[in-house]
């Protein structure tokens, strides 16, 4: 040791590290080794001599522990009382509890340390804690302080702390809590180690072929590293980042301009010292990310080998070293948290205390906004840096000035008195990792919601809401239920509160009842005592039935096939919506074969349906004889289309003489029902009611049928006896055993090899030429065609090309007339009862659709005559109709039975309440119609004295009973100045808190209540709680008549500007445009504009408008029209103003920043409004503006309240949601998955909150565009946990920014120009660089939070492998395929060749791959197959015919070659030189 000064300092672990590092750098490794050995022996020697042991006496508990615990208990009790008074939320109380215990634990620890330092510095416990070996202060705290708050397995905090320490001993409860909070030891370690090991494997696999192959890649790119210092605290030095790298640009002294270091100089500690002295802040260094080699890195870009602090050797396998360096700390960190056993620790915040007592004054520059902390304190947050002055009490003293940074929480207001050493302000910790969670607020009692009116203006501004729940019993009842009590009534146990009657429709007998307690299982079955008789009819069963309906019904001479169900030898009709009861057996509409039917489908659609009746108010005056109605107001146009001809039947009425409708003469039938509403017409005289019933009397209903025989045969083509295009006669054999029914042209089509489809188009064929005139025409009987051919029946002509001549096929048409169907009275001859709960109807059904081919060779029925059973009651499923024949009288009797399930009689929301049933009927009892069958009721479990009751109607009836149990009586003199309906908060006894119900001069009756507090609350009345509340203007005329005052109009225009800030002035109106930049950071959130459709803000200040009416001009929309000019290349636009009539103009009300009037008028600003107009342009697509690329869209979450004033709530009901920030305990258990997420480049699921009118959120676009507190943030900085940016999204955003074709506007000359910032390669390269820095910093921030330092170059090697691929979007003239993945350097090489040959290059977008995907996309298929998905990789490689060049380590080892690294690395330096012997020759 040449020059060594004597060190008289305490050498701890940190100093030992520095000592060894110094010796290693200054001397060689051998000397450093011997020094380490010497130190080791020295340590062991003195440890042996000291003989330090630990005994129970060394564990000294601080004497003031009990006092600290007592103070903590008092604080917690007081916060509990404040919570019950409704001044704190549940979340804030919990936070306060945590803070209190945390502070107690910390102060105990501080007491302990100060005691040891002062009185017992050689205490063995103290030595262990501060030795820097495996000991830790948190363990000492548990030994002699208090264990403190514990967390459960999911990381949630338990409210109860462990107050004891190990010296005092734990109770059983404490021990259980300790075990609950600690991680599950072995299992946890094993899992996490496996996880970490797998991460290491993937990292090595992705980078195993990265070797130092060359000395210099001659790259022009470099990384810029800036050493910047922020106002708040000086950031960690960046000099350690550049140690061991090579400079890519020379460094000059800024003042003297002399050269400090040249290009390619290695950055050594000496050079760093020089840079610090000269205060150089910018360095351009080389990095593995900037190296231009393919799948390898050059010596100069990598820099030092960190093992020996020399330039790395050629052939060094840096990929594997990088993988191990990143993966190994993961294994270390997983095992690190087990010493403390799940103890919660939170850092104490940095605070500013007042040095003197005095009055606080803020500077005018300091902008402050009121916020509420998570501990329930109303404080001020500074939006910019500024200062405050404390004016002292003593006259002679000087005022004290304190500087405050941005985002400082200030606890005192302006002009407020402050005492000495009181906390003035607290710094907001930016580095703290938090996540926002939502906690539902549940009621603890049932009762009525009461929201008192806000008297305090501050509460109104802060949007706080106080909600009382006044105690009471809440019941829900059906709407028409009868209540069984009054005020001051006493209800006994087991009596009912309300009742609802159950009444039947028709008379009959009860067949079945059950006495089940549950309402779901309670059933009552009734059978009607009267049957409906169908005369002259009987049911017969078919002997053998191919049909699904085996029974038929004989009525007179008609036979209907009917659908019956046989049950206990009784016939039942099964009721369902799509089934028909019976079908008439008739051959009238039967065709010989299949074919095509044509009819007017509009007729068919309306035959089945019932008569429609449309009610309409007819304003008419008695003097006028005619009424005219507009077409659209009367009927929907769709409804009218479905009718062909509507006939008019007019009922004569003295009030309505000659009512003709102006628009539909003879199309409507008009029933006047004025007499029913006579009281109505007498009052108004000018109004009358008329009903329009559309009567469907169709003069024609014909079906035209063109027959076509169709066979589908499973046979070989050789077996067919006919060929395609043959004309065959009737009864011709097609295949053996099958004969045609009609004659005509044969068409054969192959469905597949085995199935042949044969179609015979019926008709007669004529051969000849020039048949085009007859093609697709219809001829009628009596017409003559082809000179001599007379048509005998309606025919359709088709033309075909034959082998020799054209063929004309004349196909006969059959016309089926559909008659008016008879009513049932005409069929059955007698009237039937109308009082039954069902009726029979006679309908017609078409079995074929118009113009649709029916492929059939057998007979086919076109039209069915149908009997339908229609049910009138609502419970169709519970309905049965029984049929039985009376053979003597030849009658058929219909008997109705109804199964009543009581569950169907109440609303769905009441089904799960306590409603019970009580039936008054027995089995086999006769019941007349409209008899009370029973009741639905709710019984009471205990007797109550009712003080008051309230009921209200919604969907159901809600009842709130206030009984004597819900009230308290106190003497009147204890509550002075309070009247009825006043709220009372009792500080001493929380049970006597509530609302005053009665007052009898001596005593006061209080309804018990409990307040719930919701700060920063959203009102349901206001639609959106953002700066910009908007509502659409219905019409442009609204503004002209209104007297709302403003003097500022705001245009929110969509522009597409990519560079900086541009100020424009249009001289007529003084318009100033401010264009926002690419990335905007607002209150800790990053916003970006996708596709660069950025919003700008234009404030038009019209000085003449001082508190005048708004002119109607702002409701215009500017529209630009594009004009192509042939002379000039630039496209010019003309500006056009156009009035708007839709809802495109938005009206912004009460906006905080917009309406701050520059003229400062003193009028009430409640009426002020802002008109925003959007510019529409047709010739380019713009997006919806700025989207957030972070997890949260909005800076401050709003608490929600779900109940309104006067609403009745039940116990355990959710009445609102509270948002709160939760601190995440820094632990690699959260860290490892986060590293994995970043390196695997997982796509985060984006929660879509950017709906324009989303009630919970708000209008994002306008919120971000009109906000003065934008903060721009470089992407090179580390990002907090709650600002997780999706890297895929970021890559897309940047590529769009750099690579998309942009449109630029100039508003003065109205011109538009288009170009892009960079070409495709440059845009991809730059986008990749941005994402690389993001991933690098994100991974480093996770490791740094654990106190692990990894050299950047290791991560850079890995990240480079993730960001080399691109995805082809258009192949151009290259041989690539769309969506093919290829290396960026490769595609650039291909495109370069394409450009030389003047071909179209391929287009592509950058693609970010995770480490697994990157390893599988390795150019070596042997390496990829040995990693994962072996079969798939090898199959794909075999199909593609890929060649493996055996470049990496893995593939060479698998094949059995020498590893191409270290001594085995191939050197090609002499390959291209002539040999020495050749040179001699």
UniProtKB/Swiss-Prot annotation:
Binds 1 Zn(2+) ion per subunit. This is DNA-directed RNA polymerase subunit beta''. Keywords: Chloroplast, DNA-directed RNA polymerase, Metal-binding, Nucleotidyltransferase, Plastid, Transcription, Transferase, Zinc. The gene is rpoC2. It is an enzyme of class 2 (transferase). One of its GO terms (cellular component) is mitochondrion. Its cofactor is Zn(2+). In plastids the minimal PEP RNA polymerase catalytic core is composed of four subunits: alpha, beta, beta', and beta''. When a (nuclear-encoded) sigma factor is associated with the core the holoenzyme is formed, which can initiate transcription. Its EC number is 2.7.7.6. HAMAP family: RNApol_bact_RpoC2. DNA-dependent RNA polymerase catalyzes the transcription of DNA into RNA using the four ribonucleoside triphosphates as substrates. Gene3D superfamilies: 1.10.132.30, 1.10.150.390, 1.10.1790.20, RNA polymerase Rpb1, domain 3. One of its GO terms (molecular function) is DNA binding. Transmembrane segments: none annotated. PANTHER family: DNA-DIRECTED RNA POLYMERASE (PTHR19376), DNA-DIRECTED RNA POLYMERASE SUBUNIT BETA (PTHR19376:SF63). InterPro entries: DNA-dir_RpoC2_beta_pp, DNA-dir_RpoC_beta_prime, RNA_pol_Rpb1_3_sf, RNA_pol_Rpb1_4, RNA_pol_Rpb1_5, Rpb1_funnel_sf. It catalyses: RNA(n) + a ribonucleoside 5'-triphosphate = RNA(n+1) + diphosphate. Belongs to the RNA polymerase beta' chain family. RpoC2 subfamily. It is found in: Plastid, Chloroplast.
